[in-house]
Protein backbone atom coordinates (compact mmCIF):
# COMPACT_ATOMS: atom_id res chain seq x y z
CA UNK A 1 0.00 0.00 0.00
CA UNK A 2 1.27 3.49 -0.85
CA UNK A 3 1.51 5.66 2.24
CA UNK A 4 0.68 9.35 2.18
CA UNK A 5 3.45 11.77 3.07
CA UNK A 6 3.34 15.57 3.34
CA UNK A 7 5.11 17.30 0.47
CA UNK A 8 6.82 20.11 2.31
CA UNK A 9 10.34 21.09 3.28
CA UNK A 10 9.60 22.42 6.76
CA UNK A 11 9.26 26.03 5.61
CA UNK A 12 6.44 26.00 3.09
CA UNK A 13 4.08 23.58 1.42
CA UNK A 14 3.53 22.85 -2.24
CA UNK A 15 0.71 21.98 -4.59
CA UNK A 16 1.41 18.66 -6.29
CA UNK A 17 -0.42 16.14 -8.42
CA UNK A 18 0.78 12.71 -9.48
CA UNK A 19 0.47 10.76 -12.73
CA UNK A 20 1.03 7.14 -13.65
CA UNK A 21 3.48 6.61 -16.52
CA UNK A 22 1.28 3.79 -17.83
CA UNK A 23 -1.86 5.72 -18.69
CA UNK A 24 -1.30 9.29 -17.38
CA UNK A 25 -4.13 8.85 -14.89
CA UNK A 26 -4.03 11.04 -11.79
CA UNK A 27 -3.02 8.93 -8.79
CA UNK A 28 -3.22 11.61 -6.12
CA UNK A 29 -2.78 15.25 -5.19
CA UNK A 30 -1.70 17.51 -2.35
CA UNK A 31 -2.94 20.98 -1.48
CA UNK A 32 -0.78 24.02 -0.64
CA UNK A 33 -1.65 23.59 3.04
CA UNK A 34 0.83 20.83 3.68
CA UNK A 35 -1.59 18.10 2.70
CA UNK A 36 -0.73 14.50 2.02
CA UNK A 37 -0.43 12.79 -1.35
CA UNK A 38 -2.89 9.92 -1.20
CA UNK A 39 -3.62 7.61 -4.13
CA UNK A 40 -7.17 7.75 -5.45
CA UNK A 41 -7.13 3.97 -5.97
CA UNK A 42 -4.36 2.53 -3.77
CA UNK A 43 -5.32 -1.04 -4.59
CA UNK A 44 -4.53 -0.40 -8.26
CA UNK A 45 -0.99 0.92 -7.78
CA UNK A 46 1.76 -1.48 -8.78
CA UNK A 47 5.55 -1.36 -9.16
CA UNK A 48 6.02 1.13 -12.00
CA UNK A 49 7.33 4.66 -12.54
CA UNK A 50 5.15 7.63 -11.60
CA UNK A 51 5.64 11.38 -11.98
CA UNK A 52 4.85 14.30 -9.68
CA UNK A 53 4.11 17.66 -11.30
CA UNK A 54 4.36 21.13 -9.89
CA UNK A 55 6.52 23.89 -11.38
CA UNK A 56 8.99 21.14 -12.27
CA UNK A 57 8.73 17.41 -12.80
CA UNK A 58 9.94 14.71 -10.45
CA UNK A 59 9.74 10.99 -11.16
CA UNK A 60 9.60 8.15 -8.70
CA UNK A 61 8.98 4.43 -8.73
CA UNK A 62 6.63 2.42 -6.57
CA UNK A 63 8.58 -0.67 -5.52
CA UNK A 64 7.87 -3.57 -3.17
CA UNK A 65 11.58 -3.43 -2.15
CA UNK A 66 12.50 0.28 -2.19
CA UNK A 67 15.69 -0.20 -0.15
CA UNK A 68 17.09 -3.29 -1.87
CA UNK A 69 19.37 -1.58 -4.40
CA UNK A 70 20.42 1.03 -1.86
CA UNK A 71 21.47 -1.74 0.52
CA UNK A 72 23.34 -3.54 -2.23
CA UNK A 73 25.28 -0.44 -3.28
CA UNK A 74 26.02 0.58 0.30
CA UNK A 75 27.64 -2.84 0.73
CA UNK A 76 29.39 -2.73 -2.63
CA UNK A 77 31.03 0.50 -1.51
CA UNK A 78 33.36 -1.66 0.57
CA UNK A 79 34.43 -3.56 -2.54
CA UNK A 80 35.34 -0.24 -4.18
CA UNK A 81 37.45 0.60 -1.10
CA UNK A 82 39.62 -2.52 -1.45
CA UNK A 83 43.35 -1.99 -1.46
CA UNK A 84 45.99 -4.16 -3.10
CA UNK A 85 43.80 -5.61 -5.85
CA UNK A 86 42.45 -4.31 -9.16
CA UNK A 87 38.77 -3.45 -9.34
CA UNK A 88 37.80 -5.10 -12.60
CA UNK A 89 34.74 -5.78 -14.73
CA UNK A 90 32.21 -7.27 -14.48
CA UNK A 91 32.45 -6.58 -10.76
CA UNK A 92 33.41 -2.91 -11.11
CA UNK A 93 30.06 -2.07 -12.77
CA UNK A 94 31.58 0.89 -14.57
CA UNK A 95 34.20 1.88 -11.98
CA UNK A 96 37.26 -0.22 -12.83
CA UNK A 97 40.74 0.78 -11.69
CA UNK A 98 44.18 -0.81 -11.24
CA UNK A 99 45.30 -2.08 -7.85
CA UNK A 100 46.53 0.49 -5.38
CA UNK A 101 48.81 0.19 -2.36
CA UNK A 102 49.91 -3.48 -2.28
CA UNK A 103 51.36 -2.85 1.21
CA UNK A 104 53.78 -5.74 0.95
CA UNK A 105 56.74 -3.52 1.90
CA UNK A 106 55.52 -1.68 4.98
CA UNK A 107 58.02 -0.16 7.42
CA UNK A 108 57.83 -0.48 11.19
CA UNK A 109 57.76 3.07 12.54
CA UNK A 110 60.13 3.94 15.38
CA UNK A 111 57.14 4.25 17.73
CA UNK A 112 56.30 0.59 17.12
CA UNK A 113 59.82 -0.84 17.13
CA UNK A 114 60.74 -3.86 19.27
CA UNK A 115 63.83 -6.00 19.60
CA UNK A 116 62.24 -8.54 17.27
CA UNK A 117 61.01 -5.90 14.83
CA UNK A 118 63.37 -2.92 15.06
CA UNK A 119 62.74 0.40 13.35
CA UNK A 120 62.35 0.15 9.55
CA UNK A 121 61.80 -3.60 9.61
CA UNK A 122 59.82 -4.47 6.48
CA UNK A 123 56.58 -6.40 6.96
CA UNK A 124 53.65 -7.25 4.72
CA UNK A 125 50.23 -5.92 5.69
CA UNK A 126 48.35 -6.30 2.45
CA UNK A 127 44.64 -6.13 1.79
CA UNK A 128 41.79 -4.52 3.64
CA UNK A 129 39.82 -1.40 2.84
CA UNK A 130 40.87 2.20 2.49
CA UNK A 131 39.43 3.81 5.58
CA UNK A 132 37.85 6.97 4.25
CA UNK A 133 38.57 9.71 1.75
CA UNK A 134 42.29 9.07 2.21
CA UNK A 135 44.46 6.04 1.41
CA UNK A 136 45.28 4.84 4.93
CA UNK A 137 44.01 1.98 7.10
CA UNK A 138 43.15 2.37 10.78
CA UNK A 139 42.47 -0.48 13.20
CA UNK A 140 40.20 1.29 15.69
CA UNK A 141 37.84 2.46 12.96
CA UNK A 142 38.06 -0.85 11.16
CA UNK A 143 37.26 -2.77 14.35
CA UNK A 144 34.11 -0.78 15.03
CA UNK A 145 33.09 -1.18 11.38
CA UNK A 146 33.52 -4.95 11.52
CA UNK A 147 31.54 -5.11 14.75
CA UNK A 148 28.52 -3.37 13.24
CA UNK A 149 29.02 -5.37 10.02
CA UNK A 150 29.04 -8.83 11.61
CA UNK A 151 26.38 -8.07 14.21
CA UNK A 152 24.09 -6.93 11.39
CA UNK A 153 24.71 -10.24 9.64
CA UNK A 154 23.92 -12.22 12.77
CA UNK A 155 20.57 -10.45 13.12
CA UNK A 156 19.47 -11.07 9.52
CA UNK A 157 21.33 -14.19 8.38
CA UNK A 158 18.62 -15.39 5.99
CA UNK A 159 18.37 -11.96 4.39
CA UNK A 160 22.11 -11.51 3.84
CA UNK A 161 22.53 -15.07 2.65
CA UNK A 162 20.52 -14.15 -0.46
CA UNK A 163 21.98 -10.67 -1.06
CA UNK A 164 24.10 -10.83 -4.22
CA UNK A 165 26.82 -8.19 -4.48
CA UNK A 166 28.61 -9.18 -7.70
CA UNK A 167 32.10 -9.37 -6.23
CA UNK A 168 34.94 -11.73 -7.23
CA UNK A 169 34.06 -14.11 -4.37
CA UNK A 170 30.39 -14.40 -5.37
CA UNK A 171 31.00 -17.93 -6.65
CA UNK A 172 32.15 -19.16 -3.22
CA UNK A 173 29.72 -21.13 -1.03
CA UNK A 174 29.56 -18.29 1.48
CA UNK A 175 27.31 -15.21 1.65
CA UNK A 176 28.74 -12.33 -0.35
CA UNK A 177 28.58 -10.09 2.69
CA UNK A 178 30.85 -12.41 4.68
CA UNK A 179 33.23 -12.79 1.76
CA UNK A 180 33.59 -9.01 1.57
CA UNK A 181 34.12 -8.74 5.32
CA UNK A 182 36.81 -11.43 5.21
CA UNK A 183 38.88 -9.27 2.88
CA UNK A 184 39.23 -6.72 5.66
CA UNK A 185 39.49 -9.19 8.54
CA UNK A 186 42.50 -10.86 6.93
CA UNK A 187 44.24 -7.49 6.75
CA UNK A 188 43.45 -6.71 10.37
CA UNK A 189 45.16 -9.93 11.41
CA UNK A 190 48.39 -8.80 9.73
CA UNK A 191 48.45 -5.77 12.05
CA UNK A 192 49.12 -7.92 15.12
CA UNK A 193 52.72 -8.01 16.28
CA UNK A 194 54.22 -11.29 17.44
CA UNK A 195 53.74 -10.27 21.10
CA UNK A 196 49.97 -9.91 20.64
CA UNK A 197 49.83 -6.11 20.48
CA UNK A 198 48.24 -4.42 17.48
CA UNK A 199 49.50 -1.46 15.47
CA UNK A 200 47.19 1.53 15.63
CA UNK A 201 47.27 2.24 11.90
CA UNK A 202 49.00 1.70 8.58
CA UNK A 203 49.73 5.06 7.01
CA UNK A 204 51.95 7.34 5.01
CA UNK A 205 53.53 10.14 7.10
CA UNK A 206 51.12 12.75 5.73
CA UNK A 207 48.07 12.59 3.51
CA UNK A 208 48.52 11.97 -0.19
CA UNK A 209 46.97 14.49 -2.57
CA UNK A 210 43.87 13.84 -4.65
CA UNK A 211 45.75 11.53 -7.00
CA UNK A 212 45.24 8.03 -8.35
CA UNK A 213 46.31 5.35 -5.85
CA UNK A 214 48.82 3.99 -8.36
CA UNK A 215 50.57 7.38 -8.34
CA UNK A 216 51.24 7.38 -4.61
CA UNK A 217 54.95 7.20 -3.77
CA UNK A 218 55.16 7.95 -0.06
CA UNK A 219 56.51 5.24 2.28
CA UNK A 220 53.96 3.39 4.39
CA UNK A 221 54.38 2.64 8.10
CA UNK A 222 52.73 0.66 10.85
CA UNK A 223 52.60 2.92 13.88
CA UNK A 224 52.51 2.49 17.69
CA UNK A 225 50.74 -0.49 19.25
CA UNK A 226 47.86 0.76 21.41
CA UNK A 227 45.45 -0.72 23.91
CA UNK A 228 42.24 0.34 22.10
CA UNK A 229 43.48 -1.00 18.76
CA UNK A 230 44.52 -4.30 20.33
CA UNK A 231 41.18 -4.76 22.06
CA UNK A 232 39.26 -3.83 18.92
CA UNK A 233 41.11 -6.61 17.11
CA UNK A 234 40.39 -9.04 19.96
CA UNK A 235 36.67 -8.26 19.82
CA UNK A 236 36.52 -8.38 16.03
CA UNK A 237 38.27 -11.75 15.76
CA UNK A 238 36.27 -13.34 18.58
CA UNK A 239 33.06 -12.22 16.88
CA UNK A 240 34.33 -13.36 13.48
CA UNK A 241 35.33 -16.79 14.81
CA UNK A 242 31.74 -17.29 15.93
CA UNK A 243 30.13 -15.96 12.75
CA UNK A 244 32.38 -17.87 10.33
CA UNK A 245 32.24 -21.20 12.15
CA UNK A 246 29.72 -22.67 9.65
CA UNK A 247 32.12 -21.82 6.80
CA UNK A 248 35.21 -23.72 7.93
CA UNK A 249 35.11 -25.55 4.59
CA UNK A 250 35.55 -22.22 2.78
CA UNK A 251 38.12 -20.73 5.18
CA UNK A 252 39.93 -23.74 6.65
CA UNK A 253 41.75 -22.99 9.89
CA UNK A 254 40.35 -19.49 10.23
CA UNK A 255 38.26 -20.07 13.34
CA UNK A 256 41.17 -21.53 15.31
CA UNK A 257 43.55 -18.85 14.08
CA UNK A 258 41.15 -16.02 14.89
CA UNK A 259 40.38 -17.45 18.32
CA UNK A 260 44.04 -17.71 19.25
CA UNK A 261 44.80 -14.22 17.93
CA UNK A 262 41.87 -12.74 19.87
CA UNK A 263 43.00 -14.33 23.13
CA UNK A 264 46.60 -13.23 22.52
CA UNK A 265 45.49 -9.65 21.89
CA UNK A 266 43.34 -9.59 25.02
CA UNK A 267 46.20 -10.80 27.19
CA UNK A 268 48.52 -8.15 25.72
CA UNK A 269 45.96 -5.47 26.51
CA UNK A 270 45.59 -6.66 30.10
CA UNK A 271 49.36 -6.42 30.46
CA UNK A 272 49.37 -2.98 28.77
CA UNK A 273 46.02 -1.46 29.83
CA UNK A 274 46.69 2.21 29.12
CA UNK A 275 48.78 2.70 25.98
CA UNK A 276 46.95 5.35 23.99
CA UNK A 277 47.59 7.06 20.69
CA UNK A 278 48.73 10.64 21.30
CA UNK A 279 50.04 11.79 17.93
CA UNK A 280 51.60 15.14 18.96
CA UNK A 281 53.49 13.53 21.85
CA UNK A 282 54.58 10.65 19.64
CA UNK A 283 55.92 13.08 17.05
CA UNK A 284 58.04 14.77 19.70
CA UNK A 285 59.78 11.45 20.33
CA UNK A 286 59.97 9.71 16.97
CA UNK A 287 60.51 10.41 13.29
CA UNK A 288 59.18 10.68 10.73
CA UNK A 289 56.32 12.76 12.08
CA UNK A 290 52.88 11.28 11.39
CA UNK A 291 50.08 13.74 10.63
CA UNK A 292 47.30 11.55 9.23
CA UNK A 293 44.07 10.69 11.07
CA UNK A 294 44.75 10.15 14.76
CA UNK A 295 41.69 8.19 15.89
CA UNK A 296 42.90 8.99 19.38
CA UNK A 297 41.06 7.44 22.31
CA UNK A 298 42.18 7.89 25.91
CA UNK A 299 39.89 5.43 27.67
CA UNK A 300 39.93 1.68 26.96
CA UNK A 301 37.19 0.61 29.39
CA UNK A 302 34.65 0.30 26.57
CA UNK A 303 37.06 -1.73 24.44
CA UNK A 304 37.78 -4.07 27.36
CA UNK A 305 34.01 -4.48 27.81
CA UNK A 306 33.46 -5.32 24.15
CA UNK A 307 36.47 -7.65 23.82
CA UNK A 308 35.63 -9.60 26.99
CA UNK A 309 32.00 -9.87 25.87
CA UNK A 310 32.89 -11.31 22.47
CA UNK A 311 35.43 -13.70 23.97
CA UNK A 312 32.82 -14.99 26.39
CA UNK A 313 30.24 -15.49 23.64
CA UNK A 314 32.87 -17.42 21.68
CA UNK A 315 34.38 -19.54 24.45
CA UNK A 316 31.74 -19.53 27.24
CA UNK A 317 34.59 -19.12 29.70
CA UNK A 318 33.03 -17.47 32.78
CA UNK A 319 36.23 -15.53 33.41
CA UNK A 320 35.52 -13.42 30.32
CA UNK A 321 31.87 -12.97 31.35
CA UNK A 322 32.80 -11.75 34.81
CA UNK A 323 35.42 -9.38 33.45
CA UNK A 324 32.99 -8.03 30.86
CA UNK A 325 30.33 -7.23 33.43
CA UNK A 326 32.94 -5.46 35.51
CA UNK A 327 33.92 -3.26 32.58
CA UNK A 328 30.37 -2.21 31.69
CA UNK A 329 30.16 1.60 32.05
CA UNK A 330 27.45 3.09 34.22
CA UNK A 331 26.30 5.55 31.55
CA UNK A 332 24.59 4.37 28.36
CA UNK A 333 26.28 5.97 25.33
CA UNK A 334 25.54 5.47 21.61
CA UNK A 335 28.24 3.49 19.81
CA UNK A 336 30.94 5.14 17.73
CA UNK A 337 34.47 4.09 16.78
CA UNK A 338 35.68 5.81 19.96
CA UNK A 339 33.10 4.26 22.29
CA UNK A 340 32.15 0.68 21.50
CA UNK A 341 30.43 -0.13 24.81
CA UNK A 342 26.98 -0.23 23.21
CA UNK A 343 28.13 -2.98 20.84
CA UNK A 344 28.85 -5.13 23.88
CA UNK A 345 25.56 -4.21 25.54
CA UNK A 346 23.62 -5.11 22.40
CA UNK A 347 25.35 -8.48 22.33
CA UNK A 348 24.21 -9.20 25.90
CA UNK A 349 20.66 -8.19 25.02
CA UNK A 350 20.71 -10.63 22.11
CA UNK A 351 22.46 -13.42 24.05
CA UNK A 352 21.08 -13.10 27.60
CA UNK A 353 21.72 -16.67 28.76
CA UNK A 354 23.39 -16.69 32.20
CA UNK A 355 23.07 -12.89 32.57
CA UNK A 356 19.31 -12.36 32.24
CA UNK A 357 19.03 -9.58 34.82
CA UNK A 358 22.02 -7.72 33.38
CA UNK A 359 20.67 -8.07 29.83
CA UNK A 360 17.28 -6.74 30.92
CA UNK A 361 18.94 -3.76 32.60
CA UNK A 362 20.89 -2.99 29.42
CA UNK A 363 17.72 -3.28 27.33
CA UNK A 364 15.91 -0.91 29.66
CA UNK A 365 18.78 1.56 29.27
CA UNK A 366 18.50 1.36 25.47
CA UNK A 367 14.75 1.99 25.50
CA UNK A 368 15.12 4.85 27.98
CA UNK A 369 17.78 6.39 25.74
CA UNK A 370 15.44 6.24 22.72
CA UNK A 371 12.28 7.40 24.47
CA UNK A 372 12.76 11.21 24.32
CA UNK A 373 13.76 11.12 20.64
CA UNK A 374 10.72 9.07 19.69
CA UNK A 375 8.39 11.27 21.71
CA UNK A 376 9.83 14.31 19.97
CA UNK A 377 9.33 12.68 16.56
CA UNK A 378 5.71 12.05 17.36
CA UNK A 379 4.87 15.41 18.92
CA UNK A 380 7.33 18.18 18.08
CA UNK A 381 9.29 17.54 14.89
CA UNK A 382 8.93 19.22 11.50
CA UNK A 383 9.76 15.98 9.69
CA UNK A 384 8.36 13.66 12.38
CA UNK A 385 11.88 12.33 12.83
CA UNK A 386 13.68 11.14 15.98
CA UNK A 387 16.80 12.87 14.66
CA UNK A 388 17.66 16.39 13.50
CA UNK A 389 15.46 18.48 15.76
CA UNK A 390 18.18 20.48 17.54
CA UNK A 391 21.41 22.20 16.55
CA UNK A 392 23.60 19.78 18.49
CA UNK A 393 22.40 16.96 16.22
CA UNK A 394 24.66 18.30 13.46
CA UNK A 395 28.31 17.46 14.00
CA UNK A 396 31.16 15.78 12.12
CA UNK A 397 29.75 12.53 10.73
CA UNK A 398 26.25 13.18 12.07
CA UNK A 399 24.52 11.40 9.18
CA UNK A 400 26.04 8.20 10.50
CA UNK A 401 26.86 8.60 14.19
CA UNK A 402 23.71 10.59 14.88
CA UNK A 403 21.04 9.67 12.36
CA UNK A 404 21.75 6.18 10.98
CA UNK A 405 22.95 4.85 14.32
CA UNK A 406 19.77 6.05 16.00
CA UNK A 407 17.86 4.20 13.32
CA UNK A 408 19.88 1.06 14.04
CA UNK A 409 19.15 1.42 17.75
CA UNK A 410 15.46 1.58 16.83
CA UNK A 411 15.83 -1.61 14.79
CA UNK A 412 17.40 -3.41 17.75
CA UNK A 413 14.61 -2.11 19.99
CA UNK A 414 12.04 -3.41 17.51
CA UNK A 415 13.76 -6.80 17.40
CA UNK A 416 13.84 -6.99 21.19
CA UNK A 417 10.29 -5.77 21.88
CA UNK A 418 8.26 -6.31 18.70
CA UNK A 419 6.90 -2.77 19.10
CA UNK A 420 6.37 -1.31 15.60
CA UNK A 421 6.81 2.18 16.99
CA UNK A 422 10.56 1.53 16.83
CA UNK A 423 10.43 0.21 13.27
CA UNK A 424 8.56 3.32 12.12
CA UNK A 425 11.17 5.58 13.68
CA UNK A 426 14.03 3.60 12.17
CA UNK A 427 12.54 4.36 8.76
CA UNK A 428 12.15 8.01 9.70
CA UNK A 429 15.89 8.16 10.37
CA UNK A 430 16.58 6.76 6.92
CA UNK A 431 14.17 9.29 5.42
CA UNK A 432 16.37 12.03 6.84
CA UNK A 433 19.56 10.95 5.08
CA UNK A 434 17.67 10.21 1.86
CA UNK A 435 16.40 13.77 1.48
CA UNK A 436 13.83 14.69 4.11
CA UNK A 437 16.14 17.31 5.58
CA UNK A 438 16.79 21.04 5.43
CA UNK A 439 19.29 20.81 2.56
CA UNK A 440 17.13 18.69 0.26
CA UNK A 441 20.13 16.44 -0.44
CA UNK A 442 19.99 12.69 -0.56
CA UNK A 443 23.24 12.17 1.32
CA UNK A 444 24.12 8.93 -0.50
CA UNK A 445 26.19 9.23 -3.67
CA UNK A 446 24.52 8.02 -6.82
CA UNK A 447 20.99 7.98 -5.39
CA UNK A 448 18.12 10.41 -5.70
CA UNK A 449 17.83 13.46 -7.94
CA UNK A 450 19.98 15.69 -5.72
CA UNK A 451 22.94 13.88 -4.19
CA UNK A 452 26.60 14.78 -3.54
CA UNK A 453 28.72 15.07 -6.68
CA UNK A 454 32.03 16.11 -5.10
CA UNK A 455 32.66 14.00 -2.00
CA UNK A 456 35.93 14.36 -0.13
CA UNK A 457 37.02 10.97 -1.44
CA UNK A 458 40.21 10.43 -3.38
CA UNK A 459 38.94 7.30 -5.12
CA UNK A 460 35.80 9.06 -6.40
CA UNK A 461 38.00 11.84 -7.72
CA UNK A 462 39.58 9.56 -10.34
CA UNK A 463 36.34 8.81 -12.22
CA UNK A 464 35.04 11.18 -14.92
CA UNK A 465 31.56 9.64 -14.69
CA UNK A 466 30.95 10.95 -11.20
CA UNK A 467 31.54 9.69 -7.67
CA UNK A 468 31.45 6.04 -6.70
CA UNK A 469 27.86 5.12 -5.78
CA UNK A 470 26.53 4.00 -2.43
CA UNK A 471 28.63 6.16 -0.09
CA UNK A 472 27.10 8.05 2.83
CA UNK A 473 28.71 11.44 3.35
CA UNK A 474 29.19 13.04 6.76
CA UNK A 475 26.54 15.74 6.51
CA UNK A 476 25.83 19.18 8.01
CA UNK A 477 28.26 20.20 10.72
CA UNK A 478 27.64 23.25 12.88
CA UNK A 479 31.31 23.38 13.95
CA UNK A 480 32.62 23.81 10.36
CA UNK A 481 36.20 22.80 11.22
CA UNK A 482 37.30 23.29 7.60
CA UNK A 483 35.90 26.81 7.13
CA UNK A 484 38.48 28.95 5.35
CA UNK A 485 40.72 26.01 4.42
CA UNK A 486 41.40 25.10 0.77
CA UNK A 487 38.64 27.35 -0.50
CA UNK A 488 35.95 26.09 1.85
CA UNK A 489 33.53 28.95 2.56
CA UNK A 490 30.17 28.39 4.20
CA UNK A 491 27.24 30.73 3.52
CA UNK A 492 26.67 33.22 6.31
CA UNK A 493 23.68 33.05 8.62
CA UNK A 494 22.65 29.48 7.82
CA UNK A 495 21.37 27.17 10.50
CA UNK A 496 23.21 24.12 11.81
CA UNK A 497 21.13 21.76 9.67
CA UNK A 498 22.18 23.64 6.52
CA UNK A 499 25.91 23.86 7.31
CA UNK A 500 26.87 21.60 4.45
CA UNK A 501 28.88 21.99 1.24
CA UNK A 502 28.99 19.61 -1.71
CA UNK A 503 32.59 20.67 -2.28
CA UNK A 504 35.54 18.28 -2.49
CA UNK A 505 37.81 20.06 0.03
CA UNK A 506 35.06 20.04 2.69
CA UNK A 507 36.29 17.16 4.80
CA UNK A 508 34.13 18.32 7.74
CA UNK A 509 30.84 17.83 5.87
CA UNK A 510 31.45 15.88 2.66
CA UNK A 511 33.87 13.03 3.43
CA UNK A 512 33.07 9.32 3.35
CA UNK A 513 34.30 6.59 5.71
CA UNK A 514 33.81 2.87 6.18
CA UNK A 515 32.39 3.35 9.67
CA UNK A 516 29.74 5.71 8.31
CA UNK A 517 28.84 3.40 5.45
CA UNK A 518 28.42 0.41 7.71
CA UNK A 519 25.64 2.22 9.56
CA UNK A 520 23.94 3.12 6.27
CA UNK A 521 23.81 -0.46 5.02
CA UNK A 522 22.90 -1.91 8.42
CA UNK A 523 19.94 0.47 8.61
CA UNK A 524 18.76 0.00 5.02
CA UNK A 525 19.21 -3.77 5.20
CA UNK A 526 17.34 -3.97 8.48
CA UNK A 527 14.42 -2.14 6.92
CA UNK A 528 14.58 -4.05 3.63
CA UNK A 529 14.51 -7.33 5.52
CA UNK A 530 11.11 -6.34 6.91
CA UNK A 531 9.58 -5.96 3.42
Which residues fall in each region the model found?
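Glycine-rich, acidic and aromatic/proline-enriched surface loops and short helix-turn segments
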Residues: 144-155, 187, 194, 230-243, ...
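Short coil/linker segments at helix-helix boundaries
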Residues: 151-183, 215-221, 239-259
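Surface-exposed helix-capping loop/turn segments at secondary-structure junctions
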Residues: 155-162, 193-198, 243-251, 272-282, ...
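Long, well-ordered core segments of solenoidal/helical folds
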Residues: 65-86, 90, 177-196, 259-278, ...
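Hydrophobic or amphipathic alpha-helical targeting/insertion segments
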Residues: 45-71
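C-terminal transactivation domains of fungal Zn(2)-Cys(6)
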Residues: 236-295, 309, 349, 353-357
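Aromatic (Trp/Tyr) and acidic
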Residues: 1-19, 23-40, 49-52, 81-143, ...
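Surface-exposed intrinsically disordered loops and tails
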Residues: 282, 286-288, 387-388, 488-493
Amino acid sequence: MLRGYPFRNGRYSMDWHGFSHDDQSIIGQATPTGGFLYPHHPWSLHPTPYTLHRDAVASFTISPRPYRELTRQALRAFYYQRTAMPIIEPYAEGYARPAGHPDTLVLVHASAATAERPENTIISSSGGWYDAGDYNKYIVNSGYTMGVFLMAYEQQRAYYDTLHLNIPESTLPVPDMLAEAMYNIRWMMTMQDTDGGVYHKLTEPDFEGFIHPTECQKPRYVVLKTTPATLDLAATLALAARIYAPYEHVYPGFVAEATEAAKHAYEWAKANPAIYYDQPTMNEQFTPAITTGAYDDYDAQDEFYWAATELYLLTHDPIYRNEALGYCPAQFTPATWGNVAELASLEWMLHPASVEAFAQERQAALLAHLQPYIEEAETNSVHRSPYGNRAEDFFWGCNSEGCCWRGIECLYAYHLTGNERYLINAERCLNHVLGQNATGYCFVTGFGTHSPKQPHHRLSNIYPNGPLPGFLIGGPNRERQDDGIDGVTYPKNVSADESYLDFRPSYATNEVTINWNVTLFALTAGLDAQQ
